Amino acid sequence: MNGKKEMKEINTGETYTSLVTGNFIDNSKSEIMTMSLTTTDTPANGKLVTIDSDNSVSSMSVDMDADVGKFVSCSLGMLSTKEVGVFVDGITSSNDYNTQVLFYNQKTKRLENPIYKKANRGRLSTQRSTTTTCEDIDNDGIMEIPVVKKLPVLENLRNSNVSYETSWCNYDNNGNSAKIKSTVIINDNYGYSINIPNEWINNYTAY
């Protein structure tokens, strides 16, 4: 009207805990990705919502970890130079953190959550006792996922605060696996972080 664009509200009928917009399907427009925690009525899920040119609404969904009671961050980021996803860091019922990655798989034409799908007896490979969250550690545009393990404890230092080894990983959709980009020691108690050379892996500890 008079050369001005009008904004129109479209009711998608979706309820959600968190929402991110992005170009997930490799087209010329953005879609909506919603993430929902478990409620008495619905299980935890992620949904990719699209709105067509005629304002019709369609969606596809994928299961998420029902043990997560709070989302810490839901970040739009690149899995690779061509794939966009949402990196979801959450807190579980045991106060651990974990990460799930939601993305539209161009080959299968489905919304996927591969880390949750490969969970071992309900435990995700990204579950950790530290509060580290996903980030692009080297500013190359591709997000890294923290995979954390506690370092071994020497017998005479059982009561000491042992550090955690954090492997920053990229998710490889082609191989359906995580690839380690770098490994660091993070000790929140003493406030330090150290890069670890490959030859040290499995041969050291730190406090």
Model regions and ranges:
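Beta-propeller-forming repeat regions
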Residues: M1-Y207
